[in-house]
Amino acid sequence: MYLISLRGNILGVDSKKENKPYQIQEVIRMGLHCWVDVWWHNEGFYLGTNEPYYPIKPAFLNMFALWCNAMNFETLIKLKEQKAPHYFQWKGEPLMTNTLHIITDTISEMGLSDTLLITDEYDSLNLPLKGIISDNIASFKEG
């Protein structure tokens, strides 16, 4: 099962570390995967929660265990060109990654084995999910 840190958060939301490249690398060194918010801005890639903030090199996006959330349509196109693992969230609806995983915050009986669930509910570990996405992912790793 994939354990995916939401924006580099490990033990709850830490806005000072969210989407910070160093924090993302630390999460991956811990053996976790990481969801990052990616922007295409001023002819380059950036990470940032509400706006493009941290400039990154394109190679950063191809790091193993990274899940790239395109923050707008232009970014989605650029991520596709980069061949980075990516998806584009549309109005909170369930979405599908380019690697055919489903990301959602609700559970459906269909497709659980391909589903990445956004949750902080620990009983979700008993489901046959593909992975868990959480701001508190360390709790899942310990459990």
What residue ranges belong to the model's regions?
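Phosphate-group recognition and catalysis centered on beta-loop-alpha active-site segments
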Residues: 1-143
